[in-house]
Design a protein with these regions (language model features):
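HotDog/MaoC-like acyl-thioester-processing domains
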Residues: 1-15, 72, 77-158, 227-290
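Hot-dog-fold acyl-thioester-processing enzymes
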Residues: 1-65, 128-222, 280-290
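Hydrophobic beta-strand-centered segment that forms part of the acyl-chain substrate-binding groove
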Residues: 45-92, 198-246, 270
Length: 290
């Protein structure tokens, strides 16, 4: 029999921090054109909300060896009241995000019985740092269009290098309504050398894809992350990306990418990142499942 223990629930109001990302869904104008009341918040923000539970339960140990599988089921709009809840089931944390009042939003009122807007399973443990993999195909020199992504045999994308600084890490914590203490930092501010907020990893993943692909309008639907060793604010990180699958779906092109986050000679984290490239496919109104 599974041992279950409820973790403290939390109420918050969704905050859109992705208005300048270039994705039309993250602006009021672009989201309204697709049938939403307000801008759709970035998936990395919801990811950050859900990471609060393993961070508070396991602290820095989770960033050293742990993982999370986040599934984004229904778009969340800016200023939407949310309820976070979770329980420990045996050795896993199972968390969810739900709407507190769907009827406050005309677009949400069209979708009865939404259920959880996002779900996550988090775990503690996993292998240590891995050696970087080698890519069998030379990355393209220019951005790929979605048509090229769908029809080409290219399975690797250009790598990209980042050095997440204090300002980046602090802004990410602010957007996910988290505090530095969630990372195991004793002060309320992030400093160079402190643990990297997990949402910064997803931010780097998005930027790496935006650097390599002409994305247009897209929806983040899933991120499965495994930490192999702790990344820190100020680290020099190379992100290498390869395409796992691309196929047509009901709402657009469905693609799955694998990204390695490399410091020095070791893969410190790996993300399986899924997205739907809609090209306006949601113009007839919001969808209740992604």
């Amino acid at each position: 029999m599974d041992h279950r223990r409820a973790l403290p629930p939390e109420s918050l109001v969704a905050m859109n921090s992705a208005a300048s990302s270039g994705n039309p869904f993250h602006t009021d104008e672009g989201a309204r054109a697709a049938g939403y009341e307000r801008a759709v918040i970035g998936g990395l923000t919801t990811y950050g909300y859900l990471c609060s539970y393993p961070l508070r339960e396991w602290g820095a140990r989770w960033l050293e060896r742990g993982g999370i599988d986040v599934r984004l089921r229904v778009p969340i709009v800016d200023q939407q009241p949310l309820q976070l809840s979770a329980e420990m089931v045996s050795a896993e944390i199972r968390a969810r995000v739900e709407a507190i009042s769907e009827t406050q939003f005309d677009s949400m009122a069209q979708l009865p019985n939404l259920g959880p807007l996002a779900l996550a399973v988090a775990w503690l443990g996993g292998p240590g740092p891995l050696p970087p993999w080698s890519f069998p195909v030379t990355p393209p020199a220019a951005k790929l269009s979605l048509d090229q992504l769908a029809t080409s045999q290219i399975i690797s994308l250009p790598s990209m290098k980042f050095t997440p600084d204090v300002a980046w890490c602090s802004a990410t914590l602010l957007s996910t309504q988290a505090d530095a203490c969630d990372l195991g930092v004793l002060t309320s501010e992030v400093s160079k050398g402190d643990p990297l907020p997990p949402s910064v990893i997803i931010d780097m993943a998005n930027l790496a894809l935006m650097n390599a692909l002409d994305l247009g309008t897209w929806l983040h639907t899933r991120s499965k992350t495994q930490h192999f060793t702790q990344l820190r604010c100020g680290d020099e990180i190379e992100v290498r990306t390869r395409v796992l699958s691309t196929e047509p779906g009901e709402l657009g092109l469905v693609s799955v990418f694998e990204l390695a986050f490399i410091r020095g000679q070791n893969v410190c984290a790996r993300v399986e990142h899924s997205a739907i490239f809609t090209e306006g496919a949601l113009a007839n109104g919001p969808k209740d499942r992604l």
